[in-house]
């Protein structure tokens, strides 16, 4: 398994549970990129229809993992609260509620009175909202390392600070993984490399359309009031961390850095950017400096871009940090008592339709891709990992894998952009 984020470690864990010999190679540290830089939401609410089965099973698997492994990911079903004064937005939530009922998902539409009561910490009235009681959060700082620890209990191997440089083939099929520490012989590789997926696939002659969006999160500490565990509004969202601090973020807001890879795939991403133009802004040179979107090719016997940049750690967007904090304090004044503790950013790997690509690539038997989770992969990590293990072993899939098959990006230039 190449990549030690939440997708990679869960895939490795479920493979090890089936008795396979599993090694995870991670160029930096387990969970150090987007898997530890997200909100931590584990949700069914407002999921795109294609992802809902994965989201539903993932909630069950988060709980089952803790019971089976004894490891703590910080997962809890605290419920997610959405509030709005926009009639159109509330109508969209009601439409999603009607769809979700057909899938057996429970979600509660809130009247103005109910929304205002649940959102009383904001000190304002709301027209409506929605509460999803079975959804929850996990701790991004704990989750991937906890799963890696469980994997090692099962006999799996985790190699950190060990970059995978490429793949060896025999007769057109995977025969090994070349790492900076040597070659690992194997007939099956799972690539769960996040923002590095497209450039890695390019080395294999595979076109995987991917664009990264640089998003920022703000953290505040010392809040004595017990605010909602997870609250979303159109202007800002807040999430309570396991240590009592709060993460603040603006949903979908980010910067797109102009890179050669972005220009290469720009036509396929036009529908997505057109749908989200209000929150996506032109970026700068961060993407070029990071090197994960390079179009260059590299040799397997010399250091690669992954060894030069062990962990993608972009600077947070100063304007976004200021705007996020100001909006959060305006929404919940109690968040403004102590100021900003810290802020960080991450590169979110997106596909043109906002749905991940998971499946074996027909060009290279034995190579299974799992990437492009588009900023909402953390919560569905367990389900994705279980599905990957099913595909590797040939077991009956835990849910239909067809919507995630990466072959779709070759069959159609433009797919339906996901609803979030």
Language model regions located:
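Glycine-rich Rossmann-fold phosphate-binding loop(s) that bind the pyrophosphate
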Residues: 3-5, 27, 193
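C-terminal lid/capping helical subdomain adjacent to the catalytic/cofactor pocket in oxidative enzymes
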Residues: 7-10, 18, 109, 114, ...
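Flavin-dependent oxidoreductases
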Residues: 10, 167-295, 307-318, 323-336, ...
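Glycine-rich FAD pyrophosphate-binding loop
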Residues: 16-36
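Glycine-rich phosphate/pyrophosphate-binding beta-alpha loops
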Residues: 39-41, 47, 135-137, 256, ...
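Dinucleotide-binding Rossmann-like beta1-alpha1 core, especially the glycine-rich loop
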Residues: 40-114, 118, 235-238, 243-283, ...
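Short beta-strand to alpha-helix junction loop
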Residues: 53-56, 82-92, 130-150, 159, ...
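Helical element adjacent to the flavin cofactor pocket in flavoenzyme catalytic cores
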Residues: 130-188, 195-199
């Amino acid at each position: 398994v190449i990549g030690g984020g939440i997708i990679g470690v869960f895939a490795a864990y479920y493979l090890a549970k089936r008795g396979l010999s599993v090694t995870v190679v991670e160029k930096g540290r387990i969970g150090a990129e987007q898997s530890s830089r997200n909100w931590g939401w584990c949700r069914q609410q407002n999921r795109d229809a294609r992802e809902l089965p994965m989201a539903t099973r993932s909630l069950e698997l988060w709980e089952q993992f803790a019971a089976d492994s004894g490891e703590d990911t910080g997962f809890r079903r605290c419920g997610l609260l959405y509030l709005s004064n926009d009639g159109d937005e509330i109508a969209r939530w009601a439409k999603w509620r009607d769809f979700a009922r057909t899938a057996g998902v429970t979600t509660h539409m809130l009247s103005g009175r109910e929304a205002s009561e649940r959102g009383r910490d904001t000190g304002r009235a709301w027209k409506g909202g929605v509460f999803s009681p079975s959804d929850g959060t996990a701790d991004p700082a704990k989750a991937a390392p906890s799963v890696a620890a469980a994997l090692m209990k099962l006999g799996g191997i985790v190699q950190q600070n060990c970059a995978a440089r490429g793949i060896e083939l025999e007769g057109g099929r995977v025969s090994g993984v070349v790492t900076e520490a040597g070659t690992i012989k194997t007939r099956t590789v799972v690539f769960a490399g996040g923002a590095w997926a497209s450039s890695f696939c390019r080395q294999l002659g595979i076109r995987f359309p991917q664009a990264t969006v640089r998003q920022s999160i703000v953290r505040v500490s010392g809040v004595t009031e017990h605010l909602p565990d997870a609250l979303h509004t159109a202007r800002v969202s807040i999430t309570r961390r396991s240590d009592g601090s709060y993460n603040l973020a603006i949903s979908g807001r980010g910067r797109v850095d102009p890179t050669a890879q972005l220009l290469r795939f720009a036509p396929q991403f036009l529908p997505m950017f057109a749908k989200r133009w209000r929150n996506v802004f032109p970026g700068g040179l961060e993407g070029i400096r990071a090197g994960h979107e390079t179009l260059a090719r590299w040799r397997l016997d010399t250091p690669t871009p992954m060894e030069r940049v062990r962990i993608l750690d972009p600077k947070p967007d100063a304007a976004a940090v200021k705007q996020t904090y100001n909006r959060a304090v305006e929404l919940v004044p109690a968040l403004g008592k102590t100021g900003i503790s810290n802020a960080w950013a991450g590169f979110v790997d997106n596909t043109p339709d906002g749905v991940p690509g998971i499946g074996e690539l027909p060009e290279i038997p034995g190579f299974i891709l799992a990437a492009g989770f588009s900023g909402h992969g953390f919560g569905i990590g367990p389900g994705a990992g279980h599905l990957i293990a099913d595909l590797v072993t040939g077991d009956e899939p835990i849910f239909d894998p067809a919507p995630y098959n990466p072959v779709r990006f070759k069959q159609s230039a433009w797919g339906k952009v996901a609803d979030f």
